[in-house]
């Protein structure tokens, strides 16, 4: 059907933004802002020097035979007591798979590598990326050449004792790192030999389910680690519960452990026993971010005061006298009446 459209009149200087009923500002949904690979302030461009990859304040030394971090340094503090290990344990013992980490891409915003090794049983590949804010992602693919009986596939992160002072996640509330701990994906296991551990006890009271991630460290250096899957990256809200990544969860066999040993805190994510069938790949996906992600301004802990009142975002005189300097602006109020429709009345935000 032939169709012709004739548009008359002069273009609006503000594209119709002054008339809210047009919802013209929804064009921000098509914005390309933020998808550039250029680091935003205060971040800096990525650096690569031999086996070291760097971002703002942090450096990762790659263990060439495994492609995993051999050492992680945050703001001049070394985090690891020894290299991170991804272990495949069969009935014949731990696999000694060694390859070489190849640089596949380097831009201002990220550095990517690939790694591959194989033996008579398995082909193992890994794709890794580190981004300018210190986020790292490792995706392992295990392809069996034949049926393989596996006792465990696990990730071990050995953190220096002086760094691993505090722990949050994997079923634990924020606390001093316990001497030892054993937890599962969906239900914390309290044991008599684990005194002094603060556990989440109710799915209604705590938004910690599922126990898919943790942070360990102190104010100066630390690691957050998240265990992911091909269609799973952990819910940001507790309104929905996607299926766990079967590689790590393994029908409930997977879990977490903490052990304080001489000079280190060993954090382990294990998946338990399984049968790997020939030519059927399985993926193990995990991400880490090195903390702090930016320089810490400790003085702001004493000078910045926040105000949050969703329906009434205007602080009163007594609030200002108390030192309020920053207002958290929620939606559905006189200044921000529509969710996902940013600052339609920004001229009223001068208090």
Protein language model regions, located:
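Beta-strand/loop-rich accessory regions of lumenal/periplasmic or secreted enzymes
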Residues: 9-281
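An acidic-aromatic substrate-binding cleft motif
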Residues: 9-62, 285-345
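C-terminal edge beta-strand
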Residues: 2-6
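Conserved small/polar residues in nucleotide/adenosyl-binding loops
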Residues: 347-351
């Amino acid at each position: 059907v032939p169709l012709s459209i004739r548009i008359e009149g002069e273009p609006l200087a503000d594209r119709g933004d002054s008339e809210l009923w047009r919802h013209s500002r929804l064009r921000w949904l098509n914005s390309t802002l933020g998808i550039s690979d250029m680091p935003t302030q205060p971040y800096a461009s990525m650096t690569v020097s031999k086996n070291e990859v760097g971002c703002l304040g942090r450096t990762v030394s790659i263990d060439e035979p495994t492609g995993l971090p051999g050492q992680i340094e945050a703001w001049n503090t070394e985090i690891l007591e020894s290299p991170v290990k991804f272990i495949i344990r069969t009935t014949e013992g731990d696999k000694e798979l060694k390859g070489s980490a190849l640089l596949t891409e380097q831009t201002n915003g990220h550095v990517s590598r690939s790694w591959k090794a194989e033996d008579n049983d398995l082909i193992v590949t890994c794709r890794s990326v580190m981004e300018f804010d210190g986020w790292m992602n490792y995706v392992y693919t295990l392809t069996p050449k034949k049926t393989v009986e596996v006792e465990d596939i696990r990730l071990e992160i050995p953190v220096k004792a002086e760094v691993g002072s505090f722990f949050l996640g994997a079923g634990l509330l924020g606390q001093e790192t316990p001497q030892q701990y054993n937890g599962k994906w969906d239900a914390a296991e309290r044991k008599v030999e684990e005194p002094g551990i603060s556990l989440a006890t109710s799915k209604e009271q705590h938004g910690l389910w599922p126990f898919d991630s943790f942070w360990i460290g102190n104010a100066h250096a630390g690691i957050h680690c998240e265990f992911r899957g091909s269609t799973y990256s952990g819910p940001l809200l507790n309104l929905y519960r996607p299926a766990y990544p079967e590689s790590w969860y393994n029908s409930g066999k997977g879990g977490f452990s903490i052990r304080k040993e001489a000079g280190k805190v060993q954090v382990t994510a294990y998946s338990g026993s399984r049968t790997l069938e020939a030519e059927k790949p399985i993926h193990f996906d995990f991400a880490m971010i090195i903390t702090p992600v930016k320089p810490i301004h400790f003085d702001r802990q004493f000078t910045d005061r926040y105000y949050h009142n969703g329906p009434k975002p205007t602080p009163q005189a007594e609030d200002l006298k108390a030192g309020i300097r920053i207002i958290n602006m929620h939606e559905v109020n006189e200044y921000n009446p529509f969710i996902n429709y940013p600052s339609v009345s920004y001229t009223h935000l001068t208090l």
